[in-house]
Amino acid sequence: MFPSRRKAAQLPWEDGRSGLLSGGLPRKCSVFHLFVACLSLGFFSLLWLQLSCSGDVARAVRGQGQETSGPPRACPPEPPPEHWEEDASWGPHRLAVLVPFRERFEELLVFVPHMRRFLSRKKIRHHIYVLNQVDHFRFNRAALINVGFLESSNSTDYIAMHDVDLLPLNEELDYGFPEAGPFHVASPELHPLYHYKTYVGGILLLSKQHYRLCNGMSNRFWGWGREDDEFYRRIKGAGLQLFRPSGITTGYKTFRHLHDPAWRKRDQKRIAAQKQEQFKVDREGGLNTVKYHVASRTALSVGGAPCTVLNIMLDCDKTATPWCTFS
């Protein structure tokens, strides 16, 4: 969308009736009574929809000793219509913002409304997916992005692999459709922390076609770090050209970094053979091998900004990657 703001990356080597009204209405029913009844019906309908989408209804029934028939009903995969759907000035493409997440609620409360405002000002059709890992394994950012890719709406045609603690501040940053190749928004020249030339983390845009071509990301990286370096090799192996922003003059003030290492410790432990394995290229696994279960899918509004929270339970083959647990 903004070709003047993109450049090829300069590299070293070129994801019946209601029970509330049973028995009918009394003969003399005031307008006030009708209003209260309608309001109550609306409230309980919304409450039932929320519980049924999150799976809480099934859990509540089982808690009362009753059996449910089949798994909890999944919410519709398509996000609700947005105000821009009929506005051609917003362009034909739609972005799925994939946010790997675990226990960073303070950052999330800032991230969702900020990204909503930022992308709306740029007229980027989008929907935010919070990929919340709820199993007991170590955090796996790459596998969560694979899940987000598979579970995102078919109406989206490109993705942003987006850290929850990195907020774009410069309005000239391009979040448009990356037709020519993967676009690394948080380039080494602009990221507040990481400056090596092969870095592709933080914020990376890819078309869904190109992400499939790379077979997604490796699922072998449990704990913090290195999954982006392996994905860089996948990008090059797929024959794709990596692009980065050009003409941005705000330097390391281009983004706001929310992470506080003093109270938000990262899991940087290397267990068993993980230290040796982390530098290898996973030539077999990826999008086609990720194993998971979506425990619930819930539509939320954070500060008036809509998003979808996927509670995800990843599966780990402890024979192949014993470092997925701390034991």
Swiss-Prot record:
GO cellular component, one term: Golgi cisterna membrane
Entry's EC annotation: 2.4.1.-, 2.4.1.133
Cytoplasmic-side segments: 1-30
Expression by tissue: High expression in heart, pancreas and liver, medium in placenta and kidney, low in brain, skeletal muscle and lung.
Binding site for Mn(2+): D165, H257
Topology versus the membrane: Single-pass type II membrane protein
GO biological process, one term: protein modification process
Region (Disordered): 63-87
One MF annotation (Gene Ontology) recorded for this entry: xylosylprotein 4-beta-galactosyltransferase activity
Location, primary (coarse class): Golgi
Binding site for UDP-alpha-D-galactose: 100-104, 139-141, 164-165, 194, 224, 257-259, 266
Catalytic activity: 3-O-(beta-D-xylosyl)-L-seryl-[protein] + UDP-alpha-D-galactose = 3-O-(beta-D-galactosyl-(1->4)-beta-D-xylosyl)-L-seryl-[protein] + UDP + H(+)
Binding, N-acetyl-D-glucosamine: R226, E227, D228, D229
Enzyme class: transferase
Disorder: Ehlers-Danlos syndrome, spondylodysplastic type, 1: A form of Ehlers-Danlos syndrome, a group of connective tissue disorders characterized by skin hyperextensibility, articular hypermobility, and tissue fragility. EDSSPD1 is an autosomal recessive form characterized by short stature, developmental anomalies of the forearm bones and elbow, and bowing of extremities, in addition to the classic features of Ehlers-Danlos syndrome.
Record function comment: Required for the biosynthesis of the tetrasaccharide linkage region of proteoglycans, especially for small proteoglycans in skin fibroblasts.
Protein name (record): Beta-1,4-galactosyltransferase 7
Organism, scientific name: Homo sapiens (Human)
